[in-house]
């Protein structure tokens, strides 16, 4: 991560931290860096989610791109994975998504994609950051025919929808509830699932600029659960603001998270001989029950740090085609290069349709262990050295010995705050509380503030 670019682009409170001035500079400097790697005039696709600040930041960003001669294709409101897909398939130079994903409406973000549909290379982000920190803007200022032009490209949305539909099965006879989070999926999910012949009901489909992720979507699935519970819906599908993640709800109203979704799709692909190296890539936060289910099915797993960025990096490096996070980011590399909530939903319903099983039957093959996570404020200079403290290392070793393989402890520092995160999983809530509380007490005594 750099000074401006985090693991998911540049983010902040819109018009306060992520200002139009910064958006203009990101467009201008980002466009210039791209132009240095392109023999011809670069063509950049730009999209946004439904936040009220989206058009403000889009206007500034596009102005910056145009000022260095970039040809801009404006996609309007579109899911983040839609940008990734279109950049790659339409041979654009790059893509930019204006979104803060599952964050509330006051936040926004700007994320760049390279021409291959993946996040912009770290080296290029570093070049942009160097220009942002320069005392003077000495970049060329073309005029007349040297300026960039804007092309409105609303047909990009329909191309993305057709792609999604092409990956699925006919869902005739399936009654599906959808929560579009008042976000980007509000513009596509209904059409996609109608094209798949599903019988659908959609909530969270009335964005007003301020209600994105507000009591709806993958981080607030309660409304969807209540809709599905006691009805004849066979599944509920909850997306987040930019539709790059999915949380599902089974026919009984129970949550089916990213771990269970990866297991269901992974097992299906494995049985078809289509799971690359018979391996799923996941993070250290995936539940122990998920790991045990994979072991039972003889499916391998590769573990990364928290963040879909690290999952994608490992998938690219080692040639895996399925990975993701408990939070609902699922990357199916056979189809797209980033987490795609609607694509994941289509693959999940395809498994249901082809196996004839209910979602609860498929999901209950994974027994999720009770999990507890606590955040402990610690001395900032010690958060990365906690395991070097003898008393902390000893208590963790003691707790792991007591678990005897039937539980898991994870202690990791926050990347942005003076926090140590202590997580445990075990067969019962009582055991989880015991393990976490015991470790937390020692951490607070030794390095707490």
From Swiss-Prot:
Activated by phosphorylation. The keyword Signal does not apply. Signal peptide: none annotated. Keywords: Isomerase, Magnesium, Metal-binding, Phosphoprotein. The modification Phosphoserine is found at residue 101. The active site is at 101 (phosphoserine intermediate). GO terms for biological process: carbohydrate metabolic process; peptidoglycan biosynthetic process; UDP-N-acetylglucosamine biosynthetic process. One of its GO terms (cellular component) is cytosol. It comes from the Bacteria. One of its GO terms (molecular function) is phosphomannomutase activity. It holds the Pfam family PGM_PMM_IV. It catalyses: alpha-D-glucosamine 1-phosphate = D-glucosamine 6-phosphate. Coiled coil: none annotated. It is an enzyme of class 5 (isomerase). Belongs to the phosphohexose mutase family. Catalyzes the conversion of glucosamine-6-phosphate to glucosamine-1-phosphate. This is Phosphoglucosamine mutase. It comes from Streptococcus mutans serotype c (strain ATCC 700610 / UA159).
